[in-house]
């Protein structure tokens, strides 16, 4: 069997649709999806097998990165550092841009990275045929910069094989780097953490600011059930009250939603104990970011 394998950094501005694309390619719910900008905070490896037209069985290891942005907050700088490191380490890069975005995001990417990359135009199902053609034409002035320009829709599964075919074409022949049926090398506790964050954003994205997170205090993995003890962290007591809700209605909804998603991903029952704490300025404190894994992620090789 002819095989290829390689790491592919998935880059883009916040809300370009990176996590939606990966979940569609995996046919599973691993990457956090939210309409809230910068929902993805940590780099995640997602493994997609693909057989290309040349007969190669390719193992494409996507690096799902935080959205490219420039803000002075320590948390934002940690996230940007992860994205830049992924761009440098990967064999190939895919820049994902929404059909509704101007070209500034791509131009910023070009200023940061001069390495081989594919430009993918996402969310084409939300635009007219004329709008898509116009946007493709706008990007043509940079045709010498990218290997290929692929319009697609993750939500409608349009043109995804074309993207994978293009990626596989530019990977080097190699033995597979991970086991055949593995979708991610993430630990289950980290996936569960992201699911809780997603549920928080699902129900309270307009009420709860960007400075909220989840910490898994204890994770007990048994044959038939996973037991998860977690805390939602916000910065103000007023935010804590919103998350809990009157008579605990909000935290119950968040917990139930998260638990059902966790059971689907883990393929077993899940017991979830969910608490809420207020910790002032946690997103600006290095010690807090270390506990949550952001600075460790940023500094490790």
UniProtKB/Swiss-Prot annotation:
Limits of the KH type-2 domain: 204-280
GO cellular component term, pick one: cytosol
Segments forming domain Era-type G: 4-173
Lineage, uppermost ranks: Bacteria, Pseudomonadati, Campylobacterota, Epsilonproteobacteria, Campylobacterales
Gene3D superfamilies noted in UniProt: 3.30.300.20, P-loop containing nucleotide triphosphate hydrolases
Record's keyword terms, sorted: Cell inner membrane, Cell membrane, Cytoplasm, GTP-binding, Membrane, Nucleotide-binding, Ribosome biogenesis, RNA-binding, rRNA-binding
Keyword match Transcription: no
Predominant subcellular localization, coarse grouping: cytoplasm
Functional summary from the UniProt entry: An essential GTPase that binds both GDP and GTP, with rapid nucleotide exchange. Plays a role in 16S rRNA processing and 30S ribosomal subunit biogenesis and possibly also in cell cycle regulation and energy metabolism.
Region (G3): 64-67
Organism encoding this protein: Helicobacter pylori (strain J99 / ATCC 700824)
Region (G4): 122-125
Region ranges (G1): 12-19
InterPro entries linked to this entry: G_ERA_dom, GTP-bd, GTPase_Era-like, KH_dom-like_a/b, KH_dom_type_2, KH_sf_prok-type, P-loop_NTPase, Small_GTP-bd
GO MF term set: GTP binding; GTPase activity; ribosomal small subunit binding; small ribosomal subunit rRNA binding
Keyword rRNA-binding carried by entry: yes
Amino acids binding GTP: 12-19, 64-68, 122-125
Subunit details: Monomer.
Stretches the record annotates as G5: 152-154
Similarity comment: Belongs to the TRAFAC class TrmE-Era-EngA-EngB-Septin-like GTPase superfamily. Era GTPase family.
Name of this chain's protein: GTPase Era
Ranges where the record places region G2: 38-42
GO BP annotations listed: ribosomal small subunit assembly
Compartments reported by the entry: Cytoplasm; Cell inner membrane
Membrane topology label: Peripheral membrane protein
């Amino acid at each position: 069997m002819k095989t290829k394998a390689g790491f592919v950094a998935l880059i883009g501005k916040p809300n370009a649709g990176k996590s939606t694309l990966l979940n569609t390619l995996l046919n599973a719910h691993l990457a956090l999806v939210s309409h809230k900008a910068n929902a993805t905070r940590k780099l995640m490896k997602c493994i997609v097998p693909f057989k290309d037209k040349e007969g190669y069985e390719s193992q494409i290891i996507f690096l799902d990165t935080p959205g490219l942005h420039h803000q002075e907050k320590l948390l934002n700088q940690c996230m940007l550092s992860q994205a830049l490191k992924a761009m440098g380490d990967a064999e190939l890069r895919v820049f994902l841009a929404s059909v509704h975005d101007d070209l500034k995001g791509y131009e910023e990417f070009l200023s940061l990275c001069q390495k081989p990359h594919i430009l993918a135009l996402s969310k084409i199902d939300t635009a007219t045929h004329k709008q898509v053609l116009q946007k493709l034409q706008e990007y043509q002035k940079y045709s010498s910069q990218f290997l290929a320009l692929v319009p697609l829709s993750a939500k409608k599964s349009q043109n995804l094989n074309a993207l994978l075919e293009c990626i596989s074409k530019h990977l080097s022949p190699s033995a597979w780097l991970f086991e055949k049926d593995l979708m991610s090398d993430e630990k289950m506790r980290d996936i569960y953490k992201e699911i809780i964050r997603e549920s928080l954003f699902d129900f309270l994205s307009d009420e709860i600011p960007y400075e909220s997170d989840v910490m898994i205090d204890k994770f007990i993995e048994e044959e038939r059930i996973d037991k998860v003890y977690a805390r939602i962290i916000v910065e103000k007591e007023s935010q804590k009250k919103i998350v809990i809700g009157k008579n605990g209605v909000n935290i119950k909804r968040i917990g139930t939603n998260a638990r059902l998603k966790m059971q689907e991903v883990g393929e077993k029952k899940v017991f979830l104990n969910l608490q809420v704490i207020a910790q002032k300025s946690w997103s600006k404190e290095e010690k807090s970011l270390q506990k949550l894994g952001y600075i460790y992620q940023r500094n490790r090789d």
